[in-house]
Each structure stands twice: as C-alpha cells, then as structure tokens.
C-alpha cells in the first residue's frame, strides 16, 4: 500500500533558489531606495553651495551629480553620470547593480539611508573634522552627525592643482571618523545659496552658543543683507 505522502506535490524550490529570489527582491528594494535618495540629493543638494563656519574659519561645500554613485556604495557597470540620471528618473533597474565583498549589500543599505539624512544634517548640529585618513584615501575635511561622515576634498586638475574654491563631497563613511581625523570642531553656522546666487541667502543652522554678530568679517561679506543684523553690514 502506497503512503498518502507519495501523492503529495513536492516543493522543488531549493534553498539555493530561495536565496536567489531573496537576493533579487533585495536588489529591487534597494533600487527603490536609491531612487528616493537620488531625488532628495537632486532637490536639496545638487545645484547649491553650503558654507560651514567653525573655529573662526569657514569652508564652502558642494555636491556633484557624478559623486552620487560612489556615495551609495553599490557595484554597477553604469558610468557615474548615467547611474545618477537613471536613479533620479526612477529608471534604474535591479539588473544594473550588484554587491560583492567590496560593495556589501548591508553597507549599501545603510549608506543609502544616510544619503536621505544628509539634507537634515545640513540644518542640524554637526561637527567639522579636519585631516581625515582612511585605509585608502585622505580627505582635508569631513562633517559628521556622529552616525556617518561625509568626506570632502577639492578637485584637482591634470597637473594636480586644486580647482575652484569649494570642497566637493566625495565619500560617505558609515562611522563618525573622529578617530581617523586630526582635529574636530563644533559647527557654529551653516548657510546655503543656489549656485546662481552671488551671496548666501539661507541660514540653515545656528549653534545655541553662537549668533550672527560674532561672524568673521570674511564670512559676512559672503552673506546677503537679509541675513545680517541691521546696522552691522559694514562692521
């Protein structure tokens, strides 16, 4: 007599196949998150200039479209500009990205989440790190909210000379990087302006122990009159 179990349909899906399906679903989910992060990056960061005031000094910072791919931490055969364009337009596909030992999935998930938090960090308490050294790269400055760090350098021309007067965000580290930096400072002010404006028009952050009166003169010269205390424009 045959056992009734003999007639039961067998599930032919192997553990390997289940794992493959899960990985495919993971890729679809991260593609969606990358698209959301790209939209925030485009709407709130690209096309703007940010000024961080710290230690009686300041630096100006920009975000470039071609750096978005590296910030996400994913593996892809797409060029940096095409990857960003596809992500921002929500046409990036799961087949166009991948993960490996150098670009692990879990780290990518955290990095993409951090990109979505960058705009918030630009308007909240943060620290400015100077002379950051990682295992593979050195950066002049970085900014951190204690959860992650944005590392930045000035771009170089073909002769190795610095280009422009702004630092460009080039890397996102899933750590605060205090131990990797030479010095750390509290940021007292953060300003922003559109690239087509000559002066800074928006105050994004003001430390509770700082005010607009004690800014360095060179910073005041970069601010629109609407941000300056009355009667102190020419102090």
Language model region names:
Residues 1-137, 142, 192-235:
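An acidic, glycine-rich, mixed-charge low-complexity segment common to nucleic-acid enzymes
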């Amino acid at each position: 007599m045959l056992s009734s179990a003999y007639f039961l349909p067998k599930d032919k899906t192997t553990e390997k196949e289940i794992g493959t399906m899960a990985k495919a679903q993971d890729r679809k989910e991260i593609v969606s998150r990358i698209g959301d992060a790209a939209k925030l990056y485009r709407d709130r960061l690209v096309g703007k200039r940010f000024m961080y005031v710290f230690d009686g000094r300041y630096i100006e910072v920009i975000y470039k479209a071609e750096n978005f791919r590296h910030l996400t931490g994913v593996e892809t055969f797409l060029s940096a500009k095409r990857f960003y364009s596809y992500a921002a337009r929500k046409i990036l596909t799961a087949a166009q990205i991948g993960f490996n030992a150098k670009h692990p999935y879990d780290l990518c998930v955290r990095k993409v989440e951090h990109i979505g938090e960058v705009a918030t960090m630009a308007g909240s308490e943060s620290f400015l790190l100077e002379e950051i050294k990682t295992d593979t790269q050195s950066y002049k400055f970085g900014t951190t909210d204690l959860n992650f760090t944005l590392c930045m350098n000035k771009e170089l021309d073909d002769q190795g000379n610095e280009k422009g007067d702004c630092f460009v965000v080039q890397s996102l580290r899933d750590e605060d990087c205090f131990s990797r930096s030479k010095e750390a400072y509290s940021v007292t002010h953060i300003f922003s302006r559109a690239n087509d404006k000559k002066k800074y028009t928006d105050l994004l952050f003001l430390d509770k122990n700082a005010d607009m009166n004690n800014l360095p003169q060179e910073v005041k010269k970069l601010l629109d009159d609407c941000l300056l205390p009355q009667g102190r424009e020419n102090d």
